[in-house]
Amino acid sequence: MVPTPITVRVPAKVNLHLSVGDTREDGYHELVTVFQALSMTDEVTVHIADEPGIEVRGEGADSVPTGPSNLAWKAVRALAERCGRDPDEPGVRVSINKGIPVAGGMAGGSADAAAALLALNHLWRLEMGRDELAGIAADIGSDVPFALQGGTALGTGRGEQLIPVLARHTFHWVIALDRRGLETPGVFSELDRLREESRPNRVGEVEPVLEALASGDPRQLALLLGNDLQAAAVSLRPGLRRTLRAGVQAGALAGIVSGSGPTCAFLCTDADAAVRVAAELSGAGVCRTVRVAQGPVPGARLVTDDRADRPTPPQVHA
């Protein structure tokens, strides 16, 4: 009997705080970051098929690799190796429906890898716990463990070492998507170049951010948003300055480049304010698409029969 296809929904992330240290011996940078999972999601389905491989649909699908470099396919291989299976016998097919921006600094590829791990764990009836899956996830990519966990978390090391963080509030965001993506390695390289030439400002300590999250006050949190990669992203994409300025002028409490960019995230006081900011920002001509999101939300989770009841995140095309 052929197993029933398994579908997993997995969220995007935004970095509320991202402190980038110097380059380590392994080539990675030491990070201190605060992740929050947002209500922008991909859906990943795995099933047994005669032809193994990956298919991608949704916004930006043409830019997503479908070969061995795809993180979801790396997840298939990694899990197969861990449990001694051959993913080609019988074949595993991965179908990705994109709702998270591609190359946008919101960990869409990592999210797909996390979803593939969880889905295959059920398809193959491996009964691995989340901690064991998280260990495999960390070997695939720095952001993959958080996509599994979701919520709000403090990340250290490469970002893969996670501690859950208390957030007493639903935080409301407006997400501005740029017309073109940025590749994460290039942004880190640009930050290294900027630091060699000058001493760009670095974000402060993380403890005040954790206190603001515990307080549940978006105004307090807005004062503390910070991202060491923002200077590099803006250097590579100068138009982001205009986007960040436009979001604040539209009424957001604060704006930040999400991760390595170029997506910009704007924190708002409440849901109504987010809708107003999104409407004004969409008419400013500074980005391709505007979406409204909230967080924190859970990490990767199985999709059951609630699909018809699931709200679609609002978006406006500029």
From Swiss-Prot:
InterPro entries: GHMP_kinase_C_dom (IPR013750), GHMP_kinase_C_sf (IPR036554), GHMP_kinase_N_dom (IPR006204), IspE (IPR004424), Ribosomal_Su5_D2-typ_SF (IPR020568), Ribsml_uS5_D2-typ_fold_subgr (IPR014721)
Molecular-function annotations in GO: 4-(cytidine 5'-diphospho)-2-C-methyl-D-erythritol kinase activity; ATP binding
Chemical reaction(s) catalysed: 4-CDP-2-C-methyl-D-erythritol + ATP = 4-CDP-2-C-methyl-D-erythritol 2-phosphate + ADP + H(+)
Enzyme Commission code: 2.7.1.148
Pathway annotation: Isoprenoid biosynthesis; isopentenyl diphosphate biosynthesis via DXP pathway; isopentenyl diphosphate from 1-deoxy-D-xylulose 5-phosphate: step 3/6
Top-level taxon in the UniProt lineage: Bacteria
Keyword Hydrolase attached: no
Region (Disordered): 298-318
Active-site residues annotated for this sequence: K13, D143
Keyword set, alphabetical order: ATP-binding, Isoprene biosynthesis, Kinase, Nucleotide-binding, Transferase
Function: Catalyzes the phosphorylation of the position 2 hydroxy group of 4-diphosphocytidyl-2C-methyl-D-erythritol.
Protein name listed in UniProt: 4-diphosphocytidyl-2-C-methyl-D-erythritol kinase
